[in-house]
């Protein structure tokens, strides 16, 4: 069974995308708001009936209904509101994630957990510490979205399909992410060979600003892109496809970094993170990567210390 904790835009849209992959007969949506997950589940069941899909949705306000889940997706959390500091957001979401982690540990102790809650690299660290699961079973959703945004923007300039580009984005999921066009390829040729310096700079800027651009345009954050990426990750895990994704994972010496979650390429299969792929970065690339890691560490300082143990 797949459980989605949080029935807002990202959670509900992810549930809809999972319908088309038909990875499990049952998807459970859990939320603290009474009626919300039940309503989403009912609507999704109607859609599944129309499309002839076998998946059945259940909505609940009781965490016990995640019992036996092999994958849990956590989309719950507060969005940053006007006047709210980053420290306040980190503190409130850390409290929420810690509470959810306790329920996952109780009812789905063998699950693989993927989280989208922001600030991502800090919240996945909180989740990992609270769960006490092996690091391969705790994953932050980040790079799938960031790297494919970069591929999209590059494809618009080059004039090829985005899936023909192998993009690389490293480090923090946020304004200090490090897009690496020099390490991104189009059938063996570096992406930078197809771009002028001005185009290169523009792609990097657009990739970093993409989330904010969506929010500024429509008044709320992205849900379609994250949901599509989450469904693809779950597909690779459930079907043991061992596809390469970028995700925020716990580094324990990889890339010269320890005790931090950061965005790097990984192989996802039936055990969660099957392998962390270490790229051969140039000294300049490594310096930029480490600058991004410092931003991740700074985010952690905004989390109340009781949630980091």
Swiss-Prot record:
Instruction: Enumerate the catalysed reactions.
Output: (S)-malate + NAD(+) = oxaloacetate + NADH + H(+)
Domain of life of the organism encoding this protein = Archaea
Where do the catalytic residues lie? 173 (proton acceptor)
Q: Which UniProt keywords apply?
A: NAD, Oxidoreductase, Tricarboxylic acid cycle
Q: Mind listing the GO molecular function terms for this protein?
A: L-lactate dehydrogenase activity; L-malate dehydrogenase (NAD+) activity
Instruction: Give binding positions for NAD(+).
Output: 6-11, 31, 93, 116-118
Q: Which residues bind substrate?
A: 80, 86, 118, 149
Tell me which Pfam families the record gives: Ldh_1_C, Ldh_1_N
**Which EC number(s) does the record attach to this protein?**
1.1.1.37
Which is a GO BP term held by this UniProt record?
A: lactate metabolic process
NCBIfam families given in the database record: PRK06223.1
Q: Member of which family?
A: Belongs to the LDH/MDH superfamily.
Q: What does this protein do?
A: Catalyzes the reversible oxidation of malate to oxaloacetate.
Q: What is this protein called?
A: Malate dehydrogenase
Q: Which organism is it from?
A: Caldivirga maquilingensis (strain ATCC 700844 / DSM 13496 / JCM 10307 / IC-167)
Q: What is the lineage of its organism?
A: Archaea, Thermoproteota, Thermoprotei, Thermoproteales, Thermoproteaceae
Gene name, per UniProt, is mdh
